[in-house]
């Protein structure tokens, strides 16, 4: 059974075709700059070892999906004979609100519920809906599955997800913590439990990339997470501010005569590591720049300090901790950042072995010998997780 996984952005489509249930990747690709004068698509037929790059105008998501399907069935770089060989499509949907606590088969009712969340996810949900609509038009009767970034966090208790603001805001607008990166947090937590042979372990998962979040998982359930109503809350991120005094935006808006939309854009796209350093939102660039640039060093220190604080807070929330897992682009690839975050936590039982840490890749532990709290790097695979959920619902 072949499952196509789609991740639709506002101007991009990322895709992978899996042979299930073994989760073997047959083909993958990325289409960018949809709607611009020249769009770019990079397609790889994995087993054939063949790659094709296309640059042409792609007007919208439907045209993009048509182009992707033509490559999947192409004589040279295709991996299937025709579209009938696709049994199901799994869609990443960023925000499911309170409507979805697990992955679902997409129905007309489900689409309405996803549309209802566009208010609180204006950057992401409309794009996801465009991908769903394009696939439904082209593939007609093929089963579609929605996998939500928020659903894993629906187990968070009310005292952790409610904000201390007038309750009517929740009643009217469902203002609360939702959390994101749920598919990644759930996947790497499951991998940790497998490799340590500790089912239902208590784990802190640090998904650190351009977007970053920390989740406390107790007995297999998310009990708290750093992102909030939107992905803007929590850690210092590539271009997002993370936690701050809510009075700051209104103060600066008055001083600079900024609209709410302008301030939202600054906090989401011009803050975080980029805003503090003035250099880059990319941690690799900052690690290099920090050798001579104090602002780059400050940005790194703020990033690591914020993660460290969340680890301490979530240790308190969990009561007992079995392990800490690092994943995401930074979490998986920067031993330096992992080391900085875990520095000085020995008294809490968190003991990082510097030598093991420097070599940790893919799936590897790096705590000191005999330490009770396990430290792991585990590569995330959200596409595989989406494919598994899609297969289980559609088979």
UniProtKB/Swiss-Prot annotation:
Mg(2+). Can also accept Mn(2+). GO terms for cellular component: cytoplasm. Its cofactor is Mg(2+); Mn(2+). It comes from the Bacteria. The record marks 181, 240 as: Transition state stabilizer. Catalyzes the formation of acetyl phosphate from acetate and ATP. Can also catalyze the reverse reaction. This is Acetate kinase. It comes from Brachyspira hyodysenteriae (strain ATCC 49526 / WA1).
